[in-house]
């Protein structure tokens, strides 16, 4: 089948007849305009006048709306189901009204809460103390009466009542106990005071760490540090002596001069009145054992023949001197 083309369609000169593409957009030219559609007027009144949505003109004929109600399938209770997350909020509100209500805070509960927690101000900061967790260790600090003239308080710190470091919540207990000791010290002290540190009968696992003792010293108010006249350590151990020797460069020379070591309760009674000082039974027993060992050691030295001969030689030399 032969296809005839018009002359010049496939000729090279036909390309010259093609329109050239535009080099720029014609911004000033005519553009097709958009056609605006106008919505018909609808009467939204509730009467059945002409044009109203309730007018009979919008209803179908009776033949078109003839529906047999008996033939309609209606869901029964078995077909009904609930969508999760789409419960009736009013029903939930009525059913959970009692569970969501806030119980009344009685006066007894308020007193109990005050017994469990104490709010104190230390270093211009408000702190809360868990009184329940430190209840077994509150005897660690006590008031030992007064000395001299005026209200010069004696504060007794019994290390034997400190918590055991093997506790799982040891750091939490020591943190609250630290706040309790500092706040109690501020309440007990009115003027000058001294601290009696009972170190005897305290195992190593109950000894406070260096960081805890340093923190206590730093958190004590400047007034309390200034009014502290003496820090007496009863039954000092090698460990407590080492701690004080290590911390000496970090504390003031004035505080170091206030530290005194006492080896027995009898020696302590010669320094301060003991009438109001409560000494734990474990420390009394510890002091008796140490006193007995000291007396035995002293008697052994006097009964030693070598010591007796040495004393005689010293006496002879002293007599020979003019």
Curated annotation (Swiss-Prot):
Principal localisation: cytoplasm
SMART domains: SEC14 (SM00516)
Superkingdom in the source lineage: Eukaryota
CDD domains named among the record's database cross-references: SEC14 (cd00170)
Coiled-coil annotated residue ranges, if any: none
Any GO BP annotation: apoptotic process
Polar residues composition bias: residue spans: 40-52
Sorted UniProt keywords: Apoptosis, Cytoplasm
GO CC terms, sorted: cytoplasm; glutamatergic synapse; presynapse
Location(s), subcellular: Cytoplasm
Domain CRAL-TRIO intervals: 130-291
UniProt protein name: Protein prune homolog 2
Cross-referenced InterPro entries: Bcl2-/adenovirus-E1B, CRAL-TRIO_dom, CRAL-TRIO_dom_sf
Region called Disordered, residue ranges: 1-110
Gene3D superfamilies xref list: CRAL-TRIO lipid binding domain
Residue ranges, compositional bias (Acidic residues): 57-80
Role of this protein: May play an important role in regulating differentiation, survival and aggressiveness of the tumor cells.
